[in-house]
Amino acid sequence: MTKTMMIFAAAMTVMALLLVPTIEAQTECVSKLVPCFNDLNTTTTPVKECCDSIKEAVEKELTCLCTIYTSPGLLAQFNVTTEKALGLSRRCNVTTDLSACTAKGAPSPKASLPPPAPAGNTKKDAGAGNKLAGYGVTTVILSLISSIFF
């Protein structure tokens, strides 16, 4: 496994961990899509493992895909656009689009997220919460990076 793929896998795992309500399902879904990373910037048919992963995710884990497609900045962190991700699906002959995320019966990724915390009385209160969350994310990222290299 190349260094880039390992970093991508670690970053995707961190992203999945940040989606706390459905952590186990999200982590599994995202990790299954790692074989698609090398095919994102090509115009050829992706490898069979990638296409099989996409087909399975559309059939069994639509909530996860919807979360990935509709979370602002999630794909952008890897220089991937929603159009590129959907184009990869089309090259695998998987016909789905964002309307599947809002179709009747398809779970809404936003519905599973916890409600926002009540606003603090001062800006200082909000800043403290953001700092605490930042330390947690930083710790997770550093732990994953160190486990890859050591």
UniProtKB/Swiss-Prot annotation:
Residues 126-150 form a propeptide. Gene3D superfamilies: Plant lipid-transfer and hydrophobic proteins. Residues 103-125 are annotated as: Disordered. Residues 1-25 form the signal peptide. GO terms for cellular component: plasma membrane; side of membrane. Its main location: membrane. CDD domains: AAI_LTSS. It is a lipid-anchor; GPI-anchor. Transmembrane segments: none annotated. Pfam families: LTP_2. Up-regulated in the epidermis of stems. Keywords: Cell membrane, Disulfide bond, Glycoprotein, GPI-anchor, Lipoprotein, Membrane, Signal. Probable lipid transfer protein. This is Non-specific lipid transfer protein GPI-anchored 7. Belongs to the plant LTP family. Glycans are attached at N41, N79, N93. InterPro entries: Bifun_inhib/LTP/seed_sf (IPR036312), Bifunc_inhib/LTP/seed_store (IPR016140), LTSS (IPR043325). Disulfide bonds join C29-C66, C36-C50, C51-C92, C64-C101.
